[in-house]
Amino acid sequence: MFHAYYDEYCYLPVHLYEGESGKLITTLLRPGRRMRGREATAILKRVLDHLTMVWPKTKITLRGDSHFSTPEVHDLCDGYGIDFILGQAINSKLKALGEPLMELAAALAEQTDEPVRLFDRFEYQAKSWPRPHQIIYKAEITKGKANPRFVVTNIRNRTPEFLYEKIYCARGRSEGFIKNHKTYLQSDRTSCHRFSANQFRLFLHSAAYVLLHTIQQIGMRGTQWTTSNFDTIQRRMLKVGARVREQATKVRFHFSTSYPLKDLMRTVVFNLNTS
């Protein structure tokens, strides 16, 4: 489908990760258009049904960009009793509501000649929302330029600053997960003619993500490599010459005696075998 913003035909896949560990929950291929509320809830409902069945006492927080900020998703989260904190697209009404705080931030920045970041919260109801929701507003002046940000959430027992900086901004880690998946594993290679074929390719890339993530987080546990990206792991550890011997019950890999990461490889194999 043609996407006017990107000025080309493209897909816009959905990536869902566990926000602390980076474990992949699911990836689904989508047409290149903005996600509708019913589409988002159909995906999230299947995930939440499974999570709440397996871990009924686990507290779940949905964190995402503004594509997920729809009344259907808000109602879904409230229905499941889970927290949500989602980016909210800026519009003229939100901009007007945040203007007094932005003017204060601009005045403070002019006085101190330093970047200023202020926070506030207020109730807001878009035309498509059946009821108002809490908006967290960040008014920031950096290098003389305004940088407003809005977030919608149902979490009320935290300060606006904490909600934005400690909870919402932590979604930046998910960008690293997506980069590992899309860039380093090249999961954006969707050049097949059929949609189903491209979805299958995405599943294969997702399987590769799970494999490398397991090596990174379990195999490399206790080493400095747990924070390395997938590109570094592939180039330095895996893309090396080796002799492969297939036997009746096992496959043996013979590395060169000068292989520089022998100790790391032993650690990875030991950790994977004992986990």
Question: What are these model-derived regions, one by one?
Answer:
Residues 83-183, 271-275:
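An anionic, glycine-rich sequence signature occurring as long contiguous blocks
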Residues 1-16:
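Active-site-proximal, Lys/Arg-enriched surface segment
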Residues 74-83:
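Short, surface-exposed basic-aromatic patches at helix termini and helix-loop junctions that form
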Residues 211-275:
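A short, flexible helix-boundary coil/loop motif
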Residues 22, 60-69, 84, 151, ...:
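Short, conserved catalytic/metal-binding motifs centered on acidic residues
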Residues 159-200, 204, 208-216:
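Short amphipathic alpha-helical "interface-anchor" segments enriched in bulky aromatics
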Residues 20-32:
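Gly-rich Lys/Arg/Thr-decorated short loops/hinges at beta-loop-alpha junctions or inter-strand turns
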Residues 29-53:
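Active-site beta-loop-alpha junctions of metal-dependent nucleic acid enzymes
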